[in-house]
Amino acid sequence: MVVDTTAAIKRALSECTGLAEIPLVDGGEHADLATTVAFALAKTKKQAPVKIAQDVVAALKNNRELSDLGVTVEAKGPYINFVFGSAYVTAALKAAVQPGYGSFPAKESPRIVLEHTSANPNGPLHVGHIRNSIIGDSLARAFRKAGYPLEVEYYVNDMGRQIAIVTWGFDHLEHGQHESEKEDAHIARVYIAANREIEKDPGITKQVDKLMELVESGDPETVKKFRREVSRCLDGFAVTLKNLNVKHDRFVWESDFVKNGDTKAVIAKIENLPQATHEGTLLALDLAEFGFTNKYVMRRSDGTSVYAARDLAFHTWKNQNFDRAIDVLGADHKLIGAQLQCTMQLLGEKAPEIVHFEFVSLPEGSMSTRAGKFVSADELIDEVTKRAFDEVTTRRPELDEATRRNIADSVARAGIRYDIVKISPEKSTVFDWKQALDFERQSGPYIQYAHARACSILEKAGAFEECYDLATEQEIILAKKIAKFPSVIEKVVTELRPHLLATYAHELADTFNTFYHYEPVLKSEGEVRDRRLTLVKAVQNTLQESLETLGIDAIHTM
């Protein structure tokens, strides 16, 4: 309803101002939406913004579409405010009690490919990796909610130097898998041990180089070894990602773009670019004219391709199969991402959209896999789950242990996912154990608790007649907050900022708790009881849809 009403307001403003783009903002306490368009028009009309606002409002009052929607328009100084009427609130509530509220009709295009996580398979995922995963998965869920055809991909680096080192380690070192040790943790032990051997004997580097040459040439035995070790690590990743409720539709292997000739084809095109430079067989791009100081290497002096060339082949393939490509990358990939975008454009290809994120950290410090000092995502999940179980046990000691553990698993996942996604991607953050599991503050469990409270009220209430004739200020405030959910989904996918949904879910939980404090529900009677229970049903459904879009369980009891 907000989406349709907002579109109608924009159309009406465009008709009476002649402007194609009209900025609309939240109206705060006194309006549902507002615009500062009078300031923009003042420059061309040479009139005071206050006078322009009055003239625009006069024109809008005659707009039939806004009148039919029950939208009231008024000028407050240079600002134009829009207040939605009872018809809007009623329509929004009727939609909000339906399953799947906030979902947009399915679209045929654009077909979107979203790549996230894509961590090197040489050790367990750490906290930095899972911010990538959680941002990417939350975006994917929002895109699907918005009706877009979407494929979520993990790009598997099975040709990098790290994998060659792991393969050498398995060939030459005795490091069997420990009992109950995850595959990715085993891979990390071998990788760390192999690096130590290389530090002691630099001559091993030549053996690693040889492995890289063999895998590039397609040597069957070497390719088999690389894939075997990478697959084992991915099996470990799968457990971690499942525990975080993160899903991928496809795992795309880097080596496939060498095997099928795509990398060679991209390199051939790059050789013909005016920015190409050659030093023997070494091939690079000089992108200085675009502001890059370092050359963008495509092929080593030994004739083997580098990751960048294979990544270009991958993104060319994306363009052949999809209309829009989105990559989620860490801030440490800003240079690489910018070089990739620049080169794709030089090749006549559409550049991917990149969502960069700063890293999340823990007080424990370094996360360097090479040094063997990092906090794995598995350790984080285990610790948060333990703390969640203690909290649930304190709050609900009467529940049996199995139930408490199930609730703790959901609460822990909510704590981690929400604490990570609630921060705008471009901002760094420190994971706060206490805040992540705080049932009373800005946390995933706090929103889950509001949902569980709504479920409890509805269960105690039993049958009731749905009623949409709201009367009190708190009822209308809550209904209008519920009505904003579809527009938040639209904004998340437009701006690629999933934290906006996290913020909305918390605000909705807050608004519901305020409503519940001031407006008796179960103790009220007649039509008042029915309309408040209708609101509770709408809140419960909207919180459920919000939580599920954030990848968080909407549990019914806590």
UniProtKB/Swiss-Prot annotation:
Motif stretch ('HIGH' region): 119-129
EC primary class: ligase
Gene Ontology biological process: arginyl-tRNA aminoacylation
InterPro entries xrefs: aa-tRNA-synth_I_CS, Arg-tRNA-ligase, Arg-tRNA-synth_N, Arg-tRNA-synth_N_sf, ArgRS_core, DALR_anticod-bd, Rossmann-like_a/b/a_fold, tRNAsynth_Ia_anticodon-bd
SUPFAM superfamilies: Anticodon-binding domain of a subclass of class I aminoacyl-tRNA synthetases (SSF47323), Arginyl-tRNA synthetase (ArgRS), N-terminal 'additional' domain (SSF55190), Nucleotidylyl transferase (SSF52374)
Family: Belongs to the class-I aminoacyl-tRNA synthetase family.
Enzyme Commission code(s) on record: 6.1.1.19
SMART domains hit by this protein: Arg_tRNA_synt_N (SM01016), DALR_1 (SM00836)
A single GO molecular function term of this UniProt record: arginine-tRNA ligase activity
The protein, known as: Arginine--tRNA ligase
Record's keyword terms, sorted: Aminoacyl-tRNA synthetase, ATP-binding, Cytoplasm, Ligase, Nucleotide-binding, Protein biosynthesis
Gene: argS
Compartment(s) of residence: Cytoplasm
